[in-house]
Amino acid sequence: MDNKRTIVVALGGNALQKQGEASSAQQQRVAGETVRQLLPLIQAGHNVAIVHGNGPQVGNIVLHEEAINTADVPSLPLEDCGAMSQGLIGFWLQQALHDAFASNGIDRSAVSMITQTIVDSSDPAFQNPTKPIGPFYSEEEAKTVASERGYTVKEDAGRGWRRVVPSPKPQTIVEADVIKSLVSAGVTVVSTGGGGIPVLQDEAGQLKGVAAVIDKDFGAAKLADLLDADTLLILTSVDAAKINFGKPDEQSLEEVSVAELQKHIDDGQFAAGSMLPKTQAALSFLAGGTGRTAIITSLEKTAEAIAGTAGTRIKS
């Protein structure tokens, strides 16, 4: 097809886990529903790479690890838990894609890939944890958990309290060339889960995991840049980014320029930990080249957003 695009899709947490549905079977069902919403992109002939968040899952894995921590069965560090979440969620999405392809007669393959993202050891994020992971707590519960386990806790966009961990910016993705080759060949690749497993690289090129969780929207933006993708599609729980959110003059943003979006960011229109990183990630992708489009919308509006009739659309 003449208008075939390379699209990197960033899935929000709501695309994998709904409130009160945290079991494996429930999350696999949600993954299947999510894939069905993405299927029209693949049926249209686009090459698609999928990046997913892992905040709830990695936090729950950490809790499981701490619950069984003994001298004989020591708990795993945060970066290992991130790798476990990539394998787990990658399996759910890869299987859902396989089944959807089989059911719809689509001659495509899907694969999930453990992905490492290089970060900078001097990133100030290591001194200021901000990335929420794990379950929501009341303020009282959060302070108890913080005291008992040594966590840093913060309120998460008015939705409750959660543990927060360092969230350094991605510098590059180790497996990007392999992902690019697969995507170019028409394989639907699930990668860079949770923004990628954060690793440090020494002067000899050796890698070592570090305790952090990268924001998946920044990870998706970095992957999209390295793939030289046409479109970065950031999916969240709302149909579009909004200014004056919750006020009488609330307004959904449709077509917006880079300069306009930057001004809204500078004016404090977007909440940290919510819409702010999505808009910042969109701009970081657009800064990497011309002819690119970033879209922010809901999972349900995916097909309409790609067609240009829904969501917030920003072009370079």
Description of each model-found segment:
Residues 1-316:
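C-terminal catalytic "cap/lid" subdomain
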